[in-house]
A protein has these predicted regions:
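Domain-scale signature associated with acetyltransferase and cell-envelope carbohydrate enzymes
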Residues: 1-124
Length: 124
């Protein structure tokens, strides 16, 4: 999410719920109950956040990520850090986009685009 302050956040979600949401498959049933609080990039992810991997140019970031889990294709699953909980799916980019929408489904609305007491005159 490029600017989270514009969207209402939901969650946390169990990893199994996120996997089911994108028709993915967990690499281990033992990972089903892991709680995920948010989404992030490989490089910026923290514990309890989920990320994704779909581009081989980011192999180094995948190896170094601190994410709690990763959405990844079965073909690339061996590149993930050993023991990392994975959601396996055909299109990790699309899967992560769907997970992003689950965490941030609603745009925040505001009643005012400017301050209520602003007074704009000819001289501004």
């Amino acid at each position: 999410m490029s600017e989270k302050s514009f969207f209402e956040k939901t969650g946390p979600y169990k990893l199994k719920i996120l996997s089911d949401h994108i028709n993915g498959k967990l690499n281990s049933i033992e990972n089903s109950d892991i709680l995920i609080d948010d989404i992030s990039s490989l490089k910026n992810a923290k514990d309890r956040e989920i990320t994704f991997f779909s581009n081989l140019a980011y192999k180094k970031d995948l190896k170094e990520t601190l994410a709690a889990a990763c959405v990844i294709s079965e073909v690339n699953a061996d590149l993930a850090p050993k023991g990392m909980p994975l959601i396996l799916c055909d299109d990790p980019y699309m899967g992560f986009a769907l997970i992003s929408q689950k965490f941030y489904p609603k745009e925040l609305k505001t009643d005012h685009l400017t301050g209520q007491k602003n007074n704009i005159t000819n001289n501004i």
